[in-house]
């Protein structure tokens, strides 16, 4: 029991800065929306549409680079810090390489908006935002590379501090470029893209300054030796990171596709769906942070050749995450009307949102299990298991169930948005079950198999 308490303490210390950094990231999006809305509804809508194109694109790059965290954690646990610079420098090369196709996708924004039949004025503002923010792609991915270094070494506070500096800088920079203050041009919603690009470059440079000057990282000697790009290392990193990137893509696109399928059901349904989704996304940051911390702890323990420690870290992560999920689920049910009132005063929307928030409360528990189990499996570098199981859960089980219940009369009368939320529960519960079973299978193997599995 003492080991479990000690592990829980270590986990919470790691997860708290990750959570706060996520809040800062969300805060930047909130500031963009509010300040663009101060210009016009069209500017605010343009920023929202641009975010729906920008975020899935950049998330794919983040997913690829997330593979570096367990790599660094395992090397750190094994006392092989001298090998860390090679991995991070290869990661930086990967970040620059994948910036090219991501920018290429962002360049196609005009075609995407044309396909969506977006209003011409809104489309122009959206394209302007994307063309500005695409300059942030290399900086954002290089920042993630360096964050993989600090997180992998169990130093999660630097990214938290720099994330809040970024948020604080984003406010005056938005004020300058959105409203045309201090000699800057008044760009409206496009100015949010300019501010975001500047902020991400500053955040990258600040983290670079930290990793090169911190006494805590003196032994790593990140840039003392230059390691040229190696094709084998790039292929290995891509193979390790691609399943994580794809799994993130499956999850993001699941919610995006459901939003499109709900759209024809009317503005009231769409508004209620958006209230429930937005609140769920905020709550999800809590188990997501615990999952990230679990990945670090499991990787570190495996580096120390302690399969028992890795098993305890996995169990503690799931227990802590499930406990917090039960608490937030109860609060969601009890306060569902007050939650809906934070978003709107339309009683029809509030009534429907309250129903959807009950579904959201149900899936918070299984969502916590699946994201933390996935974090533990990342610690084992079992990326393909995450890829396979999330694809089956989200796209072969969750989405079809939601579609059948929401829009057809094959089983029951069309349930509308409620049907899709039942689909979410089916998908996330299936993911939790399959990832949990996989993790349990790993834990049942003997030490030699587990350590060889980790080292493959």
Curated annotation (Swiss-Prot):
Cellular component terms, GO, for this chain's entry?
plasma membrane
The places in or outside the cell where this protein is found are: Cell inner membrane
Q: Which lineage?
A: Bacteria, Pseudomonadati, Pseudomonadota, Gammaproteobacteria, Vibrionales
The UniProt entry, under Pfam families, shows:
MatE
Signal sequence span is none
- Would you identify the family this protein belongs to, as annotated? Belongs to the multi antimicrobial extrusion (MATE) (TC 2.A.66.1) family.
- What CDD domains does the annotation carry? MATE_NorM_like (cd13131)
Q: Which residues cross the membrane?
A: 11-31, 53-73, 93-113, 126-146, 159-179, 189-209, 242-262, 276-296, 315-335, 356-376, 391-411, 417-437
**Species of the source:** Vibrio vulnificus (strain YJ016)
Per the annotation, which location comes first and is thus the protein's main one?
Answer: membrane
User: What membrane topology does the annotation report for this chain?
Assistant: Multi-pass membrane protein
Domain of life (superkingdom)? Bacteria
Q: Which UniProt keywords apply?
A: Antiport, Cell inner membrane, Cell membrane, Ion transport, Membrane, Sodium, Sodium transport, Transmembrane, Transmembrane helix, Transport
Q: Name one GO molecular function term.
A: antiporter activity
Gene name of this polypeptide:
norM
State the name under which the record lists this protein: Multidrug resistance protein NorM
Q: What role does it play?
A: Multidrug efflux pump that functions as a Na(+)/drug antiporter.
Gene Ontology BP terms: sodium ion transport
